[in-house]
């Protein structure tokens, strides 16, 4: 009775500033810690004694707090002291991060210190709608399959929907070379450690790495770090945008972020509702994605990869993300199996700002290209079995004649960059001659 009364008093009259609040671990699981720690707030950092390990409050039930540790729970035990630090996790930001590799909490992974950095809260509010500048300028990626029929706008948010093994990582490397970007922020979530090192050393050029901040949280890292990595990358991109830069944010992948968030939510007692995801995962997505886009001065053009199984674009997470973004790029396993790279399905790819950022001439050429691809796909089976008869439909005949040139135009090597003038010239050559 006395202990219950004391707990109620602590909740009603929280300790004054400067007062050290501490408690003890009561339960340890593979993902979370349950501690008696009255008076804490959601997102507060805590320190676990005696090892000085950090954890974050992800749930509160009366005087008990659910903590997600920054490291593995192996070695932790009941009875350890936990001290509330009265602050939230902050992220290093600054020009000094360019060319550096950091982990999901913002700590350097290349063995060097981070001089000349500022610190910002990881979970900032998105810019108000009326403060944002409208999207009016194109952001050319240098990739013909995107710039020709789904031109991106500066400040647009695009999803890259792909099954595993169809060239997603190579496409991200090509997007890092976007000629219109001042700086890039690349976040790799849940990837294998071997692939991360190979991607940084061999897929990205040295010049690209110099203007890129790379945030890494491999598949073996705790769920909190895999979730936090995307917040850290977004916060760094916001810093560059607020300084008037044109930033490209590339996140691989949003699916692995959602799976890590699901892992924490289920361990905290949330119930899975849609596609095995708790409601908290879907409620956090809009707030996170809305942080990118146009600002008052600069812009963040964001590309988020989404893993889809058996090219199912209607699974719950893919469907939700597609509804929140300003466009989508679809990678096709069928094209990848034919050796067609980048394996972008042009007919399934869409940019919602395409009519705003392109000229009338460009839109006409893109419409012709889409129509000819669609006509060819309608009769492709007839052509393969020798049943197609020329002369029945003139438009279909033109589509068949130009199809090889269109495929050549849409293919592109990893190191090749196509400028806007050359792009329009090539479209004219293929479609109007």
Predicted regions and their residues:
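Short, charged, intrinsically disordered terminal tails
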Residues: 1-13, 422, 426-433
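Acidic-enriched and Gly/Ser
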Residues: 2-18, 24-141
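Phosphate-interacting basic helix/loop segments used at nucleotide- and nucleic-acid interfaces
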Residues: 6-9, 85, 141-146, 233, ...
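Glycine/charge-rich, flexible interdomain linkers and switch-proximal surface loops
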Residues: 20, 96-97, 147, 233
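P-loop NTPase nucleotide-binding/switch module
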Residues: 80-82, 96, 109-156, 169-174, ...
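P-loop NTPase catalytic core
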Residues: 148-150, 155-433
């Amino acid at each position: 009775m006395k202990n219950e009364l004391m707990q109620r008093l602590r909740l009603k009259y929280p300790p004054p500033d400067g007062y050290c609040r501490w408690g003890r671990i009561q339960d340890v699981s593979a993902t979370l810690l349950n501690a008696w720690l009255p008076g804490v707030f959601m997102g507060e950092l805590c320190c676990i004694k005696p090892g000085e390990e950090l954890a974050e409050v992800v749930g509160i039930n009366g005087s008990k707090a659910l903590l997600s540790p920054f490291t593995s729970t192996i070695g932790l035990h009941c009875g350890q002291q936990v001290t509330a630090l009265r602050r939230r996790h902050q992220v290093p930001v600054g020009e000094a991060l360019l060319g550096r590799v950091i982990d999901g909490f913002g700590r350097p992974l290349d063995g060097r210190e981070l001089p000349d950095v500022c610190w910002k809260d990881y979970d900032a509010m998105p810019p108000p709608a009326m403060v944002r500048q409208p999207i009016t300028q194109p952001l050319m990626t240098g990739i013909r399959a995107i710039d020709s029929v789904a031109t991106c706008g500066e400040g647009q948010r695009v999803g890259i929907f792909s099954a595993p093994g169809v060239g997603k990582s190579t496409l991200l490397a090509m997007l890092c070379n976007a000629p219109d970007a001042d700086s890039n922020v690349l976040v790799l979530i849940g990837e294998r450690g071997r692939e991360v090192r190979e991607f940084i050393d061999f897929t990205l050029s040295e010049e690209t790495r110099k203007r890129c901040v790379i945030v890494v949280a491999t598949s073996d890292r705790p769920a909190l770090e895999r979730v936090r990595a995307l917040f850290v990358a977004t916060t760094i991109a916001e810093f560059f945008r607020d300084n008037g830069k044109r930033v490209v944010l590339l996140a691989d992948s949003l699916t692995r972020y959602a799976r890590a968030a699901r892992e924490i939510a289920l361990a905290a007692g949330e119930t899975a509702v849609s596609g095995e995801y708790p409601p908290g995962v879907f409620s956090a997505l809009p707030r996170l994605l809305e942080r990118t886009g146009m600002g008052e001065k600069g812009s963040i053009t964001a590309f988020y990869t989404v893993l889809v199984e058996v090219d199912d674009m209607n699974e719950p997470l893919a469907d939700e993300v597609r509804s929140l973004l300003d466009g989508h790029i679809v990678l096709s396993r069928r094209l990848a199996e034919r050796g067609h790279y980048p394996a972008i399905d042009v007919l399934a790819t869409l940019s919602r700002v395409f009519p705003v950022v392109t000229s009338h001439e460009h839109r006409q050429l893109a419409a012709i290209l889409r129509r000819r691809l669609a006509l060819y796909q309608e009769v492709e089976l007839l052509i393969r079995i020798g049943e197609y008869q020329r002369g029945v439909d003139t438009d279909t005949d033109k589509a068949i004649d130009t199809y090889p040139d269109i495929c050549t135009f849409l293919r592109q090597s990893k190191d090749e960059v196509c400028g806007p003038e050359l792009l329009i010239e090539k479209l004219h050559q293929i479609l109007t001659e």
